[in-house]
Amino acid sequence: RQRQMCIRDSIWTTEPIVDYLTQFSGIQPDDLDPKRTQRTLVSHKTAYKKLRMLTDLGCRFIGHGLAKDFRIINIFVPPSQVIDTVQLYHSPAHPRNLSLRFLSWFLLKKDIQQGLALGVEQHDGHDSIEDALAALQLFRKYEQFERDGRLEDMLEDLYEIGPRVNWRPPEKIAS
């Protein structure tokens, strides 16, 4: 029942990549170059097999917006094995899904995905490891709110503060 990150692989391809979508993926061209990267590169098939094995073993996956990730790799993970912070922090009274960045700022007091806020395409602008750790911390925070009987109050606070800050962490003032 250990809740920790266990896969840190990047998928390489032999096909030419037209756009790395760095502002969303955090990936730079060197990251997927086997001669230059410090990342563990695996094929799509290997990544799929790892996920399939973990799914078959009954592992639970914790993340933010996992449905899209699973759809991209073309794998079905039973809903009972998915803990998605998009769903955990969704209020039936509000149609909006909350971003990982906003949830991390509001609940964890961490400003993640800083390159996204600045519109900067830099390696540390978005980091899948940082996102995975934030989702894990948000899940633990959710469990804490649930244990303490404060879940409903916290959700009300989230949806009250969100519109005031346009659902984003306030901009930091340069010193």
Question: Which positions does each model-derived feature cover?
Answer:
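Short, small-residue-biased leader/transition segments that mark boundaries at the very start
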Residues: 2-7
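A short, well-structured juxtamembrane/interface segment
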Residues: 37-52
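Metal-dependent phosphoesterase core characteristic of DEDDh/y 3'-5' exonuclease domains
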Residues: 8, 12-25, 29-31, 49-175
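Short histidine-centered catalytic/ligand-binding loop motif
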Residues: 28-40
